[in-house]
Amino acid sequence: MTRKIIALVLAMVMCLGFTACGAAEENENVLRVAMECAYAPYNWTQTDDSNGAVPISGTNDFAYGYDVMMAKLIAESMGKELEIVKLDWDSLVPAVASGDVDMVIAGQSITSERLEVVDFSDPYFYASIVTLTKADSAYANAAAVADLAGATCTSQLGTIWYDICLPQIPEANILTAQETAPAMLVALESGAVDLVVTDMPTALAATAVYSDMVLLDFTGTDGEFEVSEEEINLGISIQKGNAELLDAVNAVLAELSVEDYEAMMADAIAVQPLSE
């Protein structure tokens, strides 16, 4: 009986081994890239494949935006099929750290905190920090962070905008962080807050949709938000220690210029869905 049980277990292990090998070989031809699919102009969800959108794994929807453009370039250079995985913001780093996905391309700042658990590529976009308010707001003519004093404000959860920038506003009434960038913009549009802090691409996308929003950019002045270079450099996160994949991504980025990044972002903003 014991020999039969051992033989059965060995057979099961061999069977599982062959199955795993087959799955591994199949997965080698697929590049799994995670993003929110709700963060225009970086990434968003749409119902068709227009403009080159890519199917979102496990759904009938498609993803597009700057991050998808970049993911397509990387997958093509590696000769792999691109698979987009839709995750909420807080699940992105754990997913790539555990190896559930190959990389995250989602407008992530290259922060020291994130670098403790994942590796980052060279920057794939440089995103300055700006403020959005309404045209009829008391803050519409602000020329410095100090001019935003006393404002009721919010931003997106888990971002440097909320964690680092909002506390720099004197006597700010900081409300609960919003789960997504669209929710942050709705808070401003509805009048729930006086202003939100975000990055330039998100703000440009917002003003293209909401005609009553005003973009305030204090960058390069004495009254700008105090942030480090790492906090405004956006990178592609990869599982720690995967040097081969990191090198492959950086090789693609090395072929692109800042002007290329800006042109791609402009294209993304031009075709973003109004709902985003």
Spans of features found by a protein language model:
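Acidic, polar ligand-binding/catalytic clefts
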Residues: K72, E76, E81-D147, D222-E229
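Bilobed "Venus flytrap"/periplasmic-binding protein-like clamshell domains
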Residues: C37-A40, N60-E76, Q108, S128-L185, ...
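Periplasmic-binding protein-like
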Residues: A38, Y126-T133, V209-L253, V271-E276
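Extracytoplasmic small-molecule ligand-binding "clamshell" domains
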Residues: N27-Q108, A177
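Ligand-binding clefts/hinges and TM-proximal coupling segments of bilobed small-molecule sensing domains
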Residues: I160-E179, L215-L216, D247-E276
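Short, low-complexity disordered leader/linker segments with a strong preference
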Residues: M1-V30, E276
